[in-house]
């Protein structure tokens, strides 16, 4: 698996996450498997399609090579660019978790097929990771022991849980962290922040040291 991130800088308006505007970074990921591409998430705005195009170019590819678009969850910073991406990659099959696929489809007017436990996408294992949203999914590459984490955790200076104010079910989110801590994964790639080594060990340490 070869991974090429697309980074977008977002400003959340005052009143959404508190009284003041909030700035943050979110990533989508171009995953190359030979000549085929999986796009994981689509950033927030239609204009962010150019950032995805740049990541595709770094992968030596283009929109015509996208076979699958996998959406980790329904939040708009991950799905807002979907319709524009699909307009450039109409051949791509769009996939999301069972708890989120309908929400995404209604918000974007794009058909979303459901994936879940036991499914794989070009060799990447689909892992349901509910909590942040009901249908949140991660992708695991068994060959490199890498997990694409979506918003299960962030790593901006330090490893942290997904923001509480945007987490739909805190108990499920904790159970998801425990499940990932037990998997022995080596490399973690969150949507917010930097990749980190010792993915499962680091998540276990997060659980041990913070409530």
Model-predicted regions and their roles:
Residues 4, 70, 95, 113, ...:
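Hydrophobic/aromatic beta-strand patches that form the interior of the parallel beta-sheet core
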Residues 21-24, 129-133:
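A short catalytic or substrate-binding loop motif that flags glycine-/basic-rich loops and adjacent residues
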Residues 1-36, 47, 178-184, 198-201:
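Zn-dependent metallo-beta-lactamase
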Residues 80, 124, 167-168:
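Residue-level signal for the nucleotide or nucleotide-sugar donor/cofactor binding architecture
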Residues 1-3, 32-37, 119-125, 142-145:
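Beta-strand-turn-beta hairpins that frame and shape the catalytic cleft
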Residues 30-32, 66, 140:
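Short, well-ordered beta-strand micro-motif
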Residues 44-50, 54-121:
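Active-site HxH/HxHxD metal-binding segment of metal-dependent hydrolases
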Residues 37, 44-46, 128, 134-210:
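Metallo-beta-lactamase
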